[in-house]
């Protein structure tokens, strides 16, 4: 059913995330921001987007040939049980690092970043909400 598709997208690792310019952030995701909520970092894969705010993760699944159809998932930090980070090793070709976020419903979301600076900015935002 529809729930399965949602879980598949949420559970699929988002790899090689590249920082998005502010102007390129999905308008529908931006419309979800609340007063006092700000964007910590916005990233994209080849097609999809993930926006980390001061309160939650907003994942945008771009669908269709043009990507105009979108499915948006909101993962609030208050539902996070714990998270883990894996930094790149010396000599790793891509310098990839990964953030794994585990939620109260036993699902986890994985995000792969190029470099480590982005990873720590996002991890700090999550820490502020769950500690």
Language-model regions, residue ranges each:
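Acidic, Ser/Thr- and proline-rich intrinsically disordered linker/docking segments
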Residues: 9-20, 65-131
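Anionic N-terminal interaction surfaces
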Residues: 3-50, 114-116, 120, 131
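Conserved beta-hairpin
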Residues: 43-65
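Short amphipathic alpha-helical segments, especially helix-boundary/capping motifs
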Residues: 31, 37, 57, 98-101
């Amino acid at each position: 059913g529809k729930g399965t598709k949602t879980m598949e997208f949420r559970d699929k690792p988002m790899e090689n995330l590249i920082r998005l310019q502010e102007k390129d952030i999905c308008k529908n995701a931006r419309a979800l921001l609340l007063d006092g909520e700000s964007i910590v970092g916005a990233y994209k894969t080849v097609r999809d987007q993930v926006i980390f705010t001061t309160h939650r993760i907003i994942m945008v699944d771009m669908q269709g040939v043009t990507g105009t159809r979108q499915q948006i998932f909101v993962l609030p930090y208050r539902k996070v049980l714990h998270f883990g980070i894996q930094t790149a090793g010396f000599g790793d070709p891509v310098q990839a690092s990964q953030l794994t976020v585990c939620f109260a419903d036993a699902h986890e979301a994985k995000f792969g970043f190029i470099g480590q600076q982005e990873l720590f900015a996002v991890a700090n935002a999550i820490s502020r909400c769950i500690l």
